[in-house]
Amino acid sequence: IYITEPMKYKNLFFDLDDTIWAFSRNARDTFEEVYQKYSFDRYFDSFDHYYTLYQRRNTELWLEYGEGKVTKEELNRQRFFYPLQAVGVEDEALAERFSEDFFAIIPTKSGLMPHAKEVLEYLAPQYNLYILSNGFRELQSRKMRSAGVDRYFKKIILSEDLGVLKPWPEIFHFALSATQSELRESLMIGDSWEADMTGAHGVGTVSYTHLTL
């Protein structure tokens, strides 16, 4: 990682999923594990068939969640039920059991993005490090502990705390206020151009960068 004008910044806000914690890999591993447990090959041509259906609906639902059109509970219910419905399996109880197992397992996964821990080890003595994430509270802290990175961060700020997702400006202002950070001394680091970069830039004087560790 290279930060221009390093003395300018005191506060580094990190996204968590796929910036530090390897969400895509950890989630896929968890899905495969639970898929096998419930013998879903009897319903789907392959795991990839199931996962493609899930991801399609999950993406749609997160957009609706960000717009306030569905609740967190409805998002979770629909995204696990949809793949089964798509192949004619109207078993909502099965989808709920799958969901419960998924959420029990995924925060125990410890996979990190390449060099994430080394970067945090380097930055922690020099900057105030914070997490700013759209993830759910019951998962994010546990994921960080499982991966051994919780100790690097002074505070975790979640969009769920405010009810507003990144990239809306309100969540960035909320994070700055919650950490008593000055705009001109703060930098947002994340993997999503829209949620992390555009959102931070839209606040005005918050500096930002696009970083994949």
Which residue ranges define each predicted feature?
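Short, Lys/Arg-enriched N-terminal segments with co-localized hydrophobic residues
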Residues: I1-P6
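N-terminal helical cap/lid subdomain that shapes the substrate entry/recognition surface
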Residues: K8-P114
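Short acidic capping loops at alpha-helix termini that bridge into adjacent secondary structure
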Residues: S46, E92-A93, R151-K155, L183-S186
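Substrate-recognition element of Asp-dependent hydrolases with the DxDx(T/V) motif
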Residues: R97-G111, A116-A147, F153, I157-S159, ...
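Conserved Lys-Pro-Asp/Glu-containing loop-to-beta segment of HAD-superfamily phosphomonoesterases
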Residues: K166-M197
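Conserved small/polar residues in nucleotide/adenosyl-binding loops
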Residues: T209-L213
